[in-house]
Swiss-Prot record:
It is found in: Nucleus; Chromosome; Cytoplasm. The lineage of its organism: Eukaryota, Sar, Alveolata, Apicomplexa, Aconoidasida. It comes from Plasmodium falciparum (isolate 3D7). Changing residue 213 to F: No effect on homotrimerization and stability. Slight reduction in protein stability. It comes from the Eukaryota. The keyword Nucleus applies. Pfam families: PCNA_C, PCNA_N. InterPro entries: DNA_clamp_sf (IPR046938), Pr_cel_nuc_antig (IPR000730), Pr_cel_nuc_antig_C (IPR022649), Pr_cel_nuc_antig_CS (IPR022659), Pr_cel_nuc_antig_N (IPR022648). Keywords: Chromosome, Cytoplasm, DNA replication, DNA-binding, Nucleus. Belongs to the PCNA family. Its main location: nucleus. This is Proliferating cell nuclear antigen 1.
């Protein structure tokens, strides 16, 4: 038996909204540590890694390991049934081929049920980029600020250069109409609205990426106020968003995390590199 209750169902509603344009079908691995999803996008260019912790649910039970094949677009539709201030109970019996959802509002006068048919999905095992030794550079900043940077720069080019040293992170595009650059220096947080910028750099890094995917990753600003970027030479960039429940009546704070990975572009002209 698998059974998991989340008091704030809107968190999962936002989560599936964030990844639906990247992932089509995926296997959700359920075990005693929680729910995990790892999947490539449809073009096999980017990778999504999600872990919802068992401790992030107000109730979690998983009697044995399960693999649940789901269509993300269908999950997104299911969670559109969820209204504001509603909880969700997700369950599946061991002998069932369905994943059941029960949404209930906090007044307990509205209950919505849905039974989603599970899929049999044959997917190759994925090798999540391992960086136990740490990244060459890490930057922590406001997720909304990063979203705005990518959205604005995508008006000028389909490629963005990210350059980091201990004193600055630069986002640069080179387009037909001209060149654009946004530079952020380290700064302390001054308020809840100004998270600040933290830069840790072992060496100077400069890489280029398809801005289309960075725009899709940065949609996750609705899940977390802070994003951590991890970069190393010849390795995919990592976007990490910690998923938290900040509602006043939350039983827990940290729900889990979602990570996005994208390999740097390798075919840019040498004139664009140092």
């Amino acid at each position: 038996m698998l059974e998991a209750k989340l008091n704030n169902a809107s968190i999962l509603k936002k989560l599936f909204e964030c990844i639906k344009d990247l992932v089509n079908d995926a296997n959700v691995d359920a075990d005693e540590s929680g729910l995990k999803l790892q999947a490539l996008d449809g073009n096999h260019v980017s990778l999504v890694s999600l872990h919802l912790l068992d401790s992030g649910f107000s109730h979690y039970r998983c009697d044995r390991e399960r693999v649940l094949g789901v269509n993300i677009a269908s999950l997104n539709k299911v969670f559109k049934l969820c209204g504001a201030n509603e909880s969700v109970v997700i369950s599946s019996k061991d002998d069932e081929d369905n994943l059941n959802f029960v949404f209930e509002n906090n007044k307990e006068d509205k209950v919505t049920n849905f039974s989603l048919k599970l899929m049999s999905i044959e997917l190759d095992s994925l090798n999540i980029p391992d960086c136990e030794e740490g990244f060459d550079a890490e930057v922590e900043l406001s997720s909304k600020e990063l979203t705005n940077i990518f959205r604005n720069l995508s008006e000028f080019s389909d490629t963005v250069f990210i350059e980091i040293d201990s004193n600055c992170i630069k986002f640069t595009t080179k387009g037909i109409v001209g060149d654009a650059e946004v530079a952020l220096k380290p700064r302390d947080s001054t308020s809840e609205d100004d998270i600040g910028v933290t830069i840790k750099s072992k060496k100077k890094i400069k890489q280029s990426f398809a801005i289309k995917y960075l725009n899709l990753f940065s949609k996750s600003n609705i899940l977390a106020d802070v994003v951590v970027l991890g970069l190393s030479d010849s390795r995919p960039i990592e976007f990490k968003y910690e998923i938290k429940d900040t509602s006043p009546d939350s039983d827990t704070l940290k729900i889990g995390f979602v990570k996005f990975f994208l390999a740097p572009k390798m075919d840019d002209d040498m004139d664009n590199k140092d």
